[in-house]
Regions:
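A feature for loop-to-transmembrane-helix boundaries and adjacent hydrophobic helices
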Residues: 1-259
């Protein structure tokens, strides 16, 4: 396979440029909205205005948390020398783990406003997220960023600009963290489940998928490996997710309340 070298700019209007990466985020929020809307048809617990607020709060959390998380976890030194890079979102540079923290904070605020239970809301939100993650990884692929390690494997992709082949880990993540995780959570949550269990499965499976893919993903050059010449920042951030997910899932089985 050969990397198609897609122009990251969809349309140049002169006074503004429209980027594929930004469009992927729009697709993510639209997909979350329509998935949520299809779910509330079967439930009297949600009103349309609450759903719209939920997506708005989530979008703010994703964008602010994702960008600040990337700066803090992956690019703090460049930010200190040039704070303006925080606004250069069109070039990529979003952290899933930062986005997750941003969504958690935004959901705390949402639940405070509507006096809802935090975990019941998160159980509703969790199945809406994976397709958006998949769109984001496709945006990374179009941007030509977050490649895997150099490889001569038939699963690798030839990159003409570098004259080498690398694992297209963006596509692996789009498939596992996007499509497969969506199917798991959507089917699981289609029936009544104990409170926290859907949120727990999201943490477990995302953490596992990300941890595994990191073995063939090229670590950030300015960070490298954190320990033992194989532990990456992504793995260091994902492992606690798995542990927390297992804990919440075990706790949910002792919880009689239903999401």
């Amino acid at each position: 396979m050969t990397y198609p070298n897609i122009d990251p700019v969809i349309l140049d209007l002169g006074f503004a440029k429209i980027y594929w990466y930004g469009l992927m985020y729009i697709f993510a929020f639209i997909s979350a909205y329509f998935l949520a809307k299809s779910r509330i048809k079967k439930s009297s617990q949600w009103k349309l205005n609450e759903l719209e607020d939920l997506i708005f709060y989530g979008a703010i959390g994703v964008v602010l948390g994702g960008r600040l998380g990337y700066i803090f976890f992956y690019n703090l030194s460049d930010f200190i020398s040039n704070p303006a890079i925080i606004f250069e979102i069109q070039n990529g540079g979003m952290s899933f783990h930062g986005g997750l923290l941003g969504v958690i904070i935004s959901m705390v605020l949402f639940n405070r406003k509507y006096k809802r239970d935090f975990f019941i809301t998160m159980d509703f939100v969790a199945p809406l997220v994976p397709l958006g993650l998949g769109f984001g990884r496709i945006g990374n692929f179009i941007n030509g960023e977050l490649w895997g390690k150099v490889s001569s494997s038939s699963y690798a992709m030839f990159i003409p600009q570098e004259n080498i082949s690398r694992y297209p880990t963006q596509l692996y993540e789009a498939f596992l963290e996007g499509l497969i995780l969506f199917v798991i959570l959507w089917l699981y949550s289609s029936k009544e489940r104990s409170r926290m269990s859907t949120s727990a499965l999201f943490l477990i499976f995302y953490g596992l998928f990300r941890f595994i893919i990191e073995f063939v993903r090229e670590p950030d050059q300015h960070i490298g490996y954190l320990a033992f010449d194989w532990i990456t920042m992504g793995q260091a951030l994902s492992f606690p997710m798995i542990l927390l997910g297992v804990y919440l899932f075990m706790k949910s089985n002792k919880n009689a309340s239903i999401s």
